[in-house]
Amino acid sequence: MLERVAVLYNPLSDASIKLSRELADWLVERGVKTTRGVSQEFRDQPHLVADCDLMIALGGDGTVLRAARLCFPHNIPVLPVALGHLSFMAEIGPDEVYSGCEQIMNGGGWFDERSLVRAQLWRGGQKLSQHTALNEVVISRSDLSRIVNVHVTIDDSPLTTYHADGVIVATATGSTAYALAAGGPIVDPRSQALVLVPIAAHLTNIPSMVLHEDAVVTMQLRSRHHALLAVDGRENIDLIEGDEVVVRRSPQVCTFVRLRPSNQFYTQLVARLRRS
């Protein structure tokens, strides 16, 4: 039973704005208290998310990531609706959103819990910041710098120093995003494993790796020139030599509402890879 729904739309997409209005009206007509807005509005008024039963995200993967960041602290599930090509995150399009909502209101669908990773930035023995990602945490060279040297330790055991454009630590969900483009393996999104992927590494015999779910990955910048820390493609925090980024699985999860059977992942995977 849905009592309160938040509808997140992309303000730069006419299709997303239009559908959000129509969907909000449709939900209200059926007795569902509905709030529509952009991510900044929901960040400024977190109670609008905390009080709802579901957030519907209308847009591409960027909109879904914004919805995830808004919802996982409150354990609120997200229904992603793709405007354009279906993606690895969104399995339904605008033509299915109304029937999908009816299915959910009638008790249908299932919860797809996705692992998150938590990254802590340390400098000189002090923790500067902490971040949570659904897809990946990346240390990469800045636009003007040469390759970066990133020393990687796993569970306090030194692995290697990558001389590369960057290093990715991804969740299983993120294995089909930037990590895949960088040559990493695809991991079933229901897995809690982590994926370590160097980006355009030079002179290394340590390839991409799938790590156990409780692995603690420490990446230390060993380059004199600066690098950047990105979390799900955002933040872009400047790093200096000696900075450490410690990544581990978060105790929190992000929950998606799914309407298709869970065994369709591999069929959908092949179809989307053929299209890309």
Curated annotation (Swiss-Prot):
Domain of life: Bacteria
Pfam families per UniProt: NAD_kinase, NAD_kinase_C
Localization in the cell: Cytoplasm
Active site: D61 (proton acceptor)
An example Gene Ontology biological process: NAD metabolic process
InterPro entries assigned to the protein according to its UniProt record, in alphabetical order: ATP-NAD_kinase_N, ATP-NAD_kinase_PpnK-typ_C, NAD/diacylglycerol_kinase_sf, NADK
Reaction catalysed by this enzyme: NAD(+) + ATP = ADP + NADP(+) + H(+)
Disulfide cross-links: none
Keywords assigned by UniProt, alphabetized: ATP-binding, Cytoplasm, Kinase, NAD, NADP, Nucleotide-binding, Transferase
Cofactors that this protein relies on: a divalent metal cation
Residues involved in NAD(+) binding: D61, G62, R66, N135, E136, R146, H163, D165, A200
GO CC annotation terms, alphabetical: cytoplasm
Chief localisation class: cytoplasm
Enzyme category, top tier: transferase
Sample GO molecular function, one term: metal ion binding
EC numbers on record: 2.7.1.23
Family annotation (HAMAP family): NAD_kinase
Family the UniProt entry places it in: Belongs to the NAD kinase family.
Summary of the function given for this chain in its UniProt record: Involved in the regulation of the intracellular balance of NAD and NADP, and is a key enzyme in the biosynthesis of NADP. Catalyzes specifically the phosphorylation on 2'-hydroxyl of the adenosine moiety of NAD to yield NADP.
Protein name per Swiss-Prot or TrEMBL: NAD kinase
Species per Swiss-Prot/TrEMBL record: Chloroflexus aurantiacus (strain ATCC 29366 / DSM 635 / J-10-fl)
